[in-house]
C-alpha cells in the first residue's frame, strides 16, 4: 500500500531515492476531488501491450492498457504536501470473464512520455517475478523450516536453495 510517510522520508533524505508504490487509497486532493478520478479524467498518454504470465487460476494472456499520468500534490502531515506522479494503467478489451488488469501507482519520478511510463510499469511487473521467486523459496524449498544453528550453514543452505528456486522459476 502507499505510505505517505515513506514518500515524505524519501523526499527529505537529501539524496535521490526513487520509489514506485501501489496507490492503495483514493486520496482527497488539496483543492478537492479525488486522486484517481482526477487522473482518469486525463487523456491517455498512450497504450502499452505485454504478456501477463499465468497465475493461480489464470492462463497467460496478452494485456493492452491505456496509460494515464498526472503530476499531483498530495496532502501530507505536519511536513506539508508532496509532489508525486500518479500512473494509472487500465486494461482495455479484457477477455470475457477475466478481471481487467488495473494498476494505480505513485512515484517521485517525473513522467513526460509513454516510454517513461512504460518503464515504471515494467518495474511494477518485475515485482511479480520477485514475489514468485520468494514464494518458491519459502513454500517450495521450505527454507523457513531449516533448523541450522550456525550463520555459515544457513548462508550455504540459502545459496543452494536460491539457485534451486531460480531454476524452478525459470522452467
Could you say what each language-model-derived stretch is?
Residues 1-171:
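Single, function-defining residue in the core of a domain
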